[in-house]
Protein backbone atom coordinates (compact mmCIF):
# COMPACT_ATOMS: atom_id res chain seq x y z
CA UNK A 1 0.00 0.00 0.00
CA UNK A 2 1.33 3.43 -0.87
CA UNK A 3 0.91 6.20 1.62
CA UNK A 4 1.24 9.36 -0.39
CA UNK A 5 -0.83 11.73 -2.45
CA UNK A 6 0.21 10.12 -5.74
CA UNK A 7 -0.92 6.65 -4.84
CA UNK A 8 -4.35 5.90 -6.24
CA UNK A 9 -4.24 2.59 -8.11
CA UNK A 10 -5.56 1.98 -11.58
CA UNK A 11 -7.34 -1.11 -10.34
CA UNK A 12 -9.90 1.14 -8.68
CA UNK A 13 -13.40 0.83 -10.09
CA UNK A 14 -15.13 3.72 -11.83
CA UNK A 15 -17.40 4.16 -8.80
CA UNK A 16 -14.38 4.15 -6.50
CA UNK A 17 -12.61 6.79 -8.56
CA UNK A 18 -15.76 8.92 -8.66
CA UNK A 19 -16.05 8.79 -4.87
CA UNK A 20 -12.37 9.66 -4.46
CA UNK A 21 -12.63 12.58 -6.88
CA UNK A 22 -15.70 13.88 -5.06
CA UNK A 23 -13.86 13.79 -1.73
CA UNK A 24 -10.85 15.52 -3.28
CA UNK A 25 -13.00 18.29 -4.78
CA UNK A 26 -14.78 18.88 -1.46
CA UNK A 27 -11.48 18.82 0.45
CA UNK A 28 -9.90 21.42 -1.81
CA UNK A 29 -12.91 23.69 -2.29
CA UNK A 30 -13.62 23.78 1.45
CA UNK A 31 -10.17 23.19 2.92
CA UNK A 32 -8.03 25.64 0.97
CA UNK A 33 -10.10 28.82 1.46
CA UNK A 34 -11.15 27.72 4.95
CA UNK A 35 -7.61 27.25 6.20
CA UNK A 36 -6.42 30.39 4.39
CA UNK A 37 -9.13 32.31 6.23
CA UNK A 38 -7.91 30.98 9.57
CA UNK A 39 -4.31 31.85 8.61
CA UNK A 40 -5.32 35.39 7.62
CA UNK A 41 -7.17 36.16 10.84
CA UNK A 42 -4.90 34.37 13.34
CA UNK A 43 -1.71 35.46 11.59
CA UNK A 44 -2.44 39.02 10.51
CA UNK A 45 -5.71 40.42 11.85
CA UNK A 46 -5.95 39.38 15.48
CA UNK A 47 -3.77 40.00 18.50
CA UNK A 48 -1.23 37.22 18.97
CA UNK A 49 -1.92 34.81 21.82
CA UNK A 50 -1.05 31.24 22.69
CA UNK A 51 -4.37 30.00 21.32
CA UNK A 52 -4.14 31.89 18.02
CA UNK A 53 -0.54 30.69 17.52
CA UNK A 54 -1.64 27.06 17.91
CA UNK A 55 -4.51 27.44 15.44
CA UNK A 56 -2.37 29.43 13.00
CA UNK A 57 0.15 26.61 12.73
CA UNK A 58 -2.60 23.98 12.58
CA UNK A 59 -4.11 25.82 9.62
CA UNK A 60 -0.71 26.09 7.90
CA UNK A 61 -0.18 22.34 8.34
CA UNK A 62 -3.66 21.57 6.99
CA UNK A 63 -3.00 23.83 4.00
CA UNK A 64 0.04 21.71 3.13
CA UNK A 65 -2.41 18.80 2.83
CA UNK A 66 -4.73 20.42 0.35
CA UNK A 67 -2.36 22.47 -1.80
CA UNK A 68 -1.39 19.47 -3.94
CA UNK A 69 -4.89 18.03 -4.31
CA UNK A 70 -5.25 19.52 -7.85
CA UNK A 71 -2.22 17.46 -8.90
CA UNK A 72 -3.85 14.31 -7.57
CA UNK A 73 -7.13 15.13 -9.30
CA UNK A 74 -5.26 15.62 -12.57
CA UNK A 75 -3.48 12.30 -12.03
CA UNK A 76 -6.79 10.43 -11.70
CA UNK A 77 -8.51 12.24 -14.57
CA UNK A 78 -5.56 11.40 -16.87
CA UNK A 79 -6.09 7.69 -16.27
CA UNK A 80 -3.59 7.40 -13.41
CA UNK A 81 -0.77 8.97 -15.36
CA UNK A 82 1.68 11.23 -13.49
CA UNK A 83 2.71 14.06 -15.87
CA UNK A 84 4.46 16.38 -13.41
CA UNK A 85 7.87 14.71 -13.13
CA UNK A 86 10.05 13.47 -10.29
CA UNK A 87 10.64 16.83 -8.59
CA UNK A 88 6.94 17.57 -8.04
CA UNK A 89 6.42 13.95 -7.00
CA UNK A 90 9.01 14.22 -4.23
CA UNK A 91 8.14 17.75 -3.11
CA UNK A 92 4.49 16.75 -2.92
CA UNK A 93 5.43 13.75 -0.79
CA UNK A 94 7.44 15.96 1.58
CA UNK A 95 4.64 18.51 1.90
CA UNK A 96 1.92 15.90 2.38
CA UNK A 97 3.72 13.99 5.12
CA UNK A 98 5.08 17.11 6.83
CA UNK A 99 1.58 18.57 6.90
CA UNK A 100 0.19 15.28 8.20
CA UNK A 101 2.67 15.02 11.06
CA UNK A 102 2.50 18.71 11.98
CA UNK A 103 -1.31 18.79 11.91
CA UNK A 104 -1.56 15.84 14.29
CA UNK A 105 1.15 17.25 16.56
CA UNK A 106 -0.68 20.58 16.84
CA UNK A 107 -4.04 18.91 17.44
CA UNK A 108 -2.38 16.94 20.23
CA UNK A 109 -0.78 20.04 21.76
CA UNK A 110 -4.09 21.92 21.58
CA UNK A 111 -5.67 19.02 23.50
CA UNK A 112 -2.96 19.21 26.16
CA UNK A 113 -3.33 22.99 26.31
CA UNK A 114 -7.10 22.70 26.87
CA UNK A 115 -6.48 20.09 29.57
CA UNK A 116 -3.90 22.23 31.40
CA UNK A 117 -6.16 25.30 31.27
CA UNK A 118 -8.90 23.28 32.95
CA UNK A 119 -6.97 21.13 35.44
CA UNK A 120 -3.38 22.37 35.76
CA UNK A 121 -3.42 26.12 36.06
CA UNK A 122 -0.07 25.92 37.89
CA UNK A 123 1.58 24.55 34.74
CA UNK A 124 -0.08 27.24 32.61
CA UNK A 125 1.09 30.01 34.93
CA UNK A 126 4.63 28.68 34.84
CA UNK A 127 5.10 27.64 31.20
CA UNK A 128 2.22 28.91 29.06
CA UNK A 129 4.02 31.82 27.40
CA UNK A 130 4.31 32.63 23.72
CA UNK A 131 8.09 32.16 23.64
CA UNK A 132 7.77 28.62 25.05
CA UNK A 133 4.96 27.78 22.65
CA UNK A 134 7.01 29.06 19.70
CA UNK A 135 9.92 26.80 20.69
CA UNK A 136 7.56 23.81 20.80
CA UNK A 137 6.11 24.74 17.42
CA UNK A 138 9.53 25.08 15.78
CA UNK A 139 10.62 21.72 17.20
CA UNK A 140 7.36 20.15 15.95
CA UNK A 141 7.96 21.43 12.41
CA UNK A 142 11.57 20.20 12.43
CA UNK A 143 10.53 16.73 13.65
CA UNK A 144 7.73 16.63 11.06
CA UNK A 145 10.17 17.40 8.25
CA UNK A 146 12.70 14.83 9.49
CA UNK A 147 10.06 12.11 9.77
CA UNK A 148 8.84 12.94 6.25
CA UNK A 149 12.26 12.83 4.61
CA UNK A 150 12.37 9.02 4.06
CA UNK A 151 9.10 9.17 2.12
CA UNK A 152 10.50 11.87 -0.15
CA UNK A 153 13.83 10.06 -0.61
CA UNK A 154 12.24 6.81 -1.78
CA UNK A 155 9.66 8.49 -3.98
CA UNK A 156 10.07 7.73 -7.68
CA UNK A 157 8.25 8.07 -10.98
CA UNK A 158 7.83 4.40 -11.79
CA UNK A 159 6.98 2.86 -15.18
CA UNK A 160 8.04 -0.74 -14.71
CA UNK A 161 4.58 -2.22 -13.97
CA UNK A 162 2.74 -0.92 -17.04
CA UNK A 163 3.11 1.51 -19.91
CA UNK A 164 2.24 4.40 -17.66
CA UNK A 165 3.99 6.69 -15.19
CA UNK A 166 3.22 6.61 -11.48
CA UNK A 167 4.43 8.59 -8.48
CA UNK A 168 5.21 5.77 -6.04
CA UNK A 169 7.44 4.82 -3.15
CA UNK A 170 10.14 2.37 -4.25
CA UNK A 171 11.46 0.43 -1.25
CA UNK A 172 11.97 -2.83 -3.08
CA UNK A 173 15.49 -2.51 -4.46
CA UNK A 174 16.98 -4.69 -1.68
CA UNK A 175 16.20 -6.21 1.72
CA UNK A 176 17.78 -3.33 3.65
CA UNK A 177 15.47 -0.71 2.17
CA UNK A 178 12.47 -2.98 2.67
CA UNK A 179 13.41 -3.30 6.36
CA UNK A 180 13.81 0.48 6.52
CA UNK A 181 10.31 0.82 5.09
CA UNK A 182 8.88 -1.22 7.94
CA UNK A 183 10.81 0.78 10.54
CA UNK A 184 9.58 4.05 9.02
CA UNK A 185 6.00 2.77 8.90
CA UNK A 186 6.10 1.61 12.54
CA UNK A 187 7.44 4.97 13.72
CA UNK A 188 4.80 6.72 11.66
CA UNK A 189 1.98 4.59 13.06
CA UNK A 190 3.04 5.35 16.63
CA UNK A 191 3.83 9.05 16.16
CA UNK A 192 0.88 10.14 14.05
CA UNK A 193 -1.90 7.92 15.32
CA UNK A 194 -1.45 5.79 18.43
CA UNK A 195 0.15 8.36 20.75
CA UNK A 196 -1.98 11.32 19.54
CA UNK A 197 -5.17 9.25 19.81
CA UNK A 198 -4.46 8.25 23.40
CA UNK A 199 -3.50 11.80 24.41
CA UNK A 200 -6.51 13.44 22.75
CA UNK A 201 -8.99 10.90 24.09
CA UNK A 202 -7.53 11.24 27.60
CA UNK A 203 -7.57 15.05 27.61
CA UNK A 204 -10.95 15.56 25.99
CA UNK A 205 -12.72 12.79 27.88
CA UNK A 206 -11.57 14.32 31.17
CA UNK A 207 -12.74 17.72 29.97
CA UNK A 208 -16.15 16.35 29.04
CA UNK A 209 -16.80 14.14 32.05
CA UNK A 210 -15.03 16.02 34.86
CA UNK A 211 -15.13 19.60 33.70
CA UNK A 212 -18.31 19.74 31.64
CA UNK A 213 -19.91 22.14 34.12
CA UNK A 214 -17.34 24.75 33.17
CA UNK A 215 -17.56 24.30 29.39
CA UNK A 216 -19.88 26.30 27.17
CA UNK A 217 -22.24 24.46 24.84
CA UNK A 218 -20.08 25.51 21.89
CA UNK A 219 -16.89 24.21 23.49
CA UNK A 220 -18.55 20.88 24.30
CA UNK A 221 -19.78 20.42 20.72
CA UNK A 222 -16.37 21.42 19.36
CA UNK A 223 -14.61 18.82 21.51
CA UNK A 224 -17.03 16.02 20.58
CA UNK A 225 -16.88 16.81 16.86
CA UNK A 226 -13.08 17.09 16.82
CA UNK A 227 -12.66 13.70 18.53
CA UNK A 228 -15.23 12.06 16.27
CA UNK A 229 -13.83 13.51 13.05
CA UNK A 230 -10.27 12.53 13.93
CA UNK A 231 -11.19 8.94 14.80
CA UNK A 232 -13.54 8.48 11.82
CA UNK A 233 -11.23 9.99 9.20
CA UNK A 234 -7.87 8.71 10.45
CA UNK A 235 -8.66 5.22 11.76
CA UNK A 236 -9.34 3.47 8.38
CA UNK A 237 -6.06 4.77 6.94
CA UNK A 238 -4.06 3.64 9.96
CA UNK A 239 -5.72 0.22 10.10
CA UNK A 240 -4.62 -0.37 6.51
CA UNK A 241 -1.25 1.10 7.41
CA UNK A 242 -0.88 -1.46 10.22
CA UNK A 243 -1.96 -4.33 7.96
CA UNK A 244 0.65 -3.26 5.44
CA UNK A 245 3.35 -3.18 8.11
CA UNK A 246 2.73 -6.73 9.38
CA UNK A 247 3.11 -8.22 5.89
CA UNK A 248 1.24 -8.99 2.69
CA UNK A 249 0.50 -12.62 3.60
CA UNK A 250 -1.94 -11.48 6.31
CA UNK A 251 -4.42 -9.71 4.05
CA UNK A 252 -6.19 -9.85 0.71
CA UNK A 253 -4.32 -7.61 -1.73
CA UNK A 254 -7.43 -6.77 -3.76
CA UNK A 255 -9.18 -5.50 -0.64
CA UNK A 256 -6.26 -3.23 0.20
CA UNK A 257 -6.10 -1.92 -3.37
CA UNK A 258 -9.79 -0.97 -3.20
CA UNK A 259 -9.72 0.51 0.31
CA UNK A 260 -6.35 2.29 0.42
CA UNK A 261 -7.10 5.18 -1.98
CA UNK A 262 -10.42 5.90 -0.27
CA UNK A 263 -8.76 5.94 3.15
CA UNK A 264 -6.13 8.36 1.82
CA UNK A 265 -8.84 10.63 0.44
CA UNK A 266 -10.41 10.72 3.92
CA UNK A 267 -7.08 12.01 5.24
CA UNK A 268 -7.33 14.87 2.75
CA UNK A 269 -10.90 15.51 3.88
CA UNK A 270 -9.71 15.86 7.47
CA UNK A 271 -7.69 18.92 6.47
CA UNK A 272 -10.90 20.78 5.59
CA UNK A 273 -12.87 19.69 8.65
CA UNK A 274 -11.20 21.82 11.34
CA UNK A 275 -12.07 25.33 10.07
CA UNK A 276 -15.61 24.17 9.33
CA UNK A 277 -15.96 22.91 12.90
CA UNK A 278 -14.92 26.28 14.31
CA UNK A 279 -17.20 28.25 11.99
CA UNK A 280 -20.31 26.07 12.21
CA UNK A 281 -20.13 25.51 15.96
CA UNK A 282 -19.49 29.19 16.57
CA UNK A 283 -22.26 30.35 14.25
CA UNK A 284 -25.06 27.92 15.02
CA UNK A 285 -24.36 26.53 18.49
CA UNK A 286 -22.50 28.94 20.74
CA UNK A 287 -22.66 32.45 19.30
CA UNK A 288 -25.92 32.72 17.38
CA UNK A 289 -26.08 36.49 17.77
CA UNK A 290 -22.59 37.12 16.40
CA UNK A 291 -21.36 37.39 12.83
CA UNK A 292 -19.28 34.57 11.35
CA UNK A 293 -16.10 36.62 11.78
CA UNK A 294 -16.88 37.42 15.43
CA UNK A 295 -17.82 33.80 16.15
CA UNK A 296 -14.56 32.56 14.65
CA UNK A 297 -12.60 35.04 16.75
CA UNK A 298 -14.34 34.01 19.96
CA UNK A 299 -13.49 30.35 19.31
CA UNK A 300 -9.90 30.76 18.09
CA UNK A 301 -8.64 33.60 20.29
CA UNK A 302 -7.83 34.09 23.94
CA UNK A 303 -10.85 36.31 24.43
CA UNK A 304 -13.13 33.31 24.67
CA UNK A 305 -10.68 31.63 27.07
CA UNK A 306 -10.68 34.65 29.35
CA UNK A 307 -14.47 34.91 29.20
CA UNK A 308 -14.83 31.22 30.02
CA UNK A 309 -12.33 31.42 32.88
CA UNK A 310 -14.30 34.31 34.40
CA UNK A 311 -17.54 32.35 34.07
CA UNK A 312 -15.85 29.33 35.67
CA UNK A 313 -14.78 31.37 38.67
CA UNK A 314 -18.36 32.56 39.17
CA UNK A 315 -19.64 28.96 38.93
CA UNK A 316 -17.05 27.81 41.45
CA UNK A 317 -18.14 30.52 43.87
CA UNK A 318 -21.77 29.47 43.48
CA UNK A 319 -20.88 25.83 44.09
CA UNK A 320 -18.88 26.66 47.20
Curated annotation (Swiss-Prot):
Cytoplasmic-facing ranges: 40-52, 113-133, 210-222, 282-320
Listed GO CC annotations: host cell plasma membrane; plasma membrane
KW Disulfide bond (keyword) present: yes
Topology of this chain in the membrane: Multi-pass membrane protein
Glycosylation-annotated residues: 175
GO molecular function, one term: G protein-coupled receptor activity
Entry keywords, A to Z: Disulfide bond, G-protein coupled receptor, Glycoprotein, Host cell membrane, Host membrane, Membrane, Receptor, Transducer, Transmembrane, Transmembrane helix
Transmembrane portions of the chain: 19-39, 53-73, 92-112, 134-154, 189-209, 223-243, 261-281
Disulfide bridges in this chain: 89-167
Pfam families: 7tm_1
Positions on the Extracellular side per record topology: 1-18, 74-91, 155-188, 244-260
Gene Ontology biological process terms from the UniProt entry: phospholipase C-activating G protein-coupled receptor signaling pathway; positive regulation of cytosolic calcium ion concentration
UniProt subcellular location: Host cell membrane
InterPro entries assigned: ATII_rcpt (IPR000248), Formyl_rcpt-rel (IPR000826), GPCR_Rhodpsn (IPR000276), GPCR_Rhodpsn_7TM (IPR017452)
Record-linked PANTHER family: CHEMOTACTIC RECEPTOR (PTHR24225), G-PROTEIN COUPLED RECEPTORS FAMILY 1 PROFILE DOMAIN-CONTAINING PROTEIN (PTHR24225:SF24)
Assigned protein family: Belongs to the G-protein coupled receptor 1 family.
UniProt-recorded name of the protein: G-protein coupled receptor homolog FPV021
Amino acid sequence: MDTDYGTVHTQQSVKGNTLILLIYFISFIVGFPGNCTVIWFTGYRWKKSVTTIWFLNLAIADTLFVIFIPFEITYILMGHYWPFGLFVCRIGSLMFNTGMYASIFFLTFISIDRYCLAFRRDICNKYRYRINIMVMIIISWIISILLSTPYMYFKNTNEKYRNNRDCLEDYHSDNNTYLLRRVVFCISLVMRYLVPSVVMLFCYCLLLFKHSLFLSKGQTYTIVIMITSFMVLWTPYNILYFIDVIGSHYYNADTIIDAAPISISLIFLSSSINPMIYMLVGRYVSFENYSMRESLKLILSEERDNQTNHENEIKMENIN
